[in-house]
Amino acid sequence: MNNLVPAQAGAQFITLFIFITLARWYVAPWLAKRERADALIALLWVHVFRYVALQIFVAQRDGFPISTHGAMEIIIGDVGGAIIAFAAIVLLRQGAFAGVVLCWLLVAETATDTFLNIRSGIEEHLMGAASGVTWMILVFFVPAIIVSVGLLAWQLVARRSEPRNEHQRRELPVAAGRLLEQR
């Protein structure tokens, strides 16, 4: 009996459950105490390191049975996501609304990338084939990406009416500023 598939799937599920629990108990309350841009930036940093997907070439060389097309799909999606995340951080730090737009783009890109990677993994029978660093990325980093993109989407929706930055908050009428502070 091959225990590799249930081991990987089980480990991914457990990690996902733990990250969701951490997000509920600790991350969500912490985000609520931050300005919108700061909350988004904190969540974006997880995505900046998606270039770790370049490791797929080493895994492929060492016997991970992914096709070159499948590897390139992963690289394009994850390196692209890392670039979008970093650009969004830069723009949010400058107070530019384009940073929020890039956050939405990252949510859509990550959802698409995740779907395509799952589809490719099924088509190429990759579940349970990972080992070493590839296994660690799939079991720990991928669930972190999934949870952080969920939190990112939640922050974008829940805080869509907040001013973009502290400067805009100071320009609000006094009563409007008090309403925002009570949130």
Question: What is the predicted function of each stretch?
Answer:
Residues A53-L102:
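Membrane-proximal helix-loop-helix units in multi-pass membrane proteins
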Residues Y51-D62, A111-G128:
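C-terminal ends of transmembrane alpha-helices
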Residues G77, G81-A85, L102-I122, V142-I145:
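Hydrophobic alpha-helical membrane segments
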Residues V27-L40, R93-G99, S161-E162:
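Membrane-interface helix-boundary motifs at transmembrane edges
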Residues L4-V5, P65-I76, M127-L138:
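Non-cytosolic membrane-interface motifs at loop->transmembrane helix junctions
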Residues S161-R183:
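Short, highly charged, low-complexity non-transmembrane loops/tails of multi-pass membrane proteins
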Residues Q12-R24, G80-A88, F140-Q155:
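Hydrophobic cores of alpha-helical transmembrane segments in multi-pass inner/ER membrane proteins
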Residues L116-E123, W135-P163:
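C-terminal transmembrane-bundle signature of multipass membrane proteins
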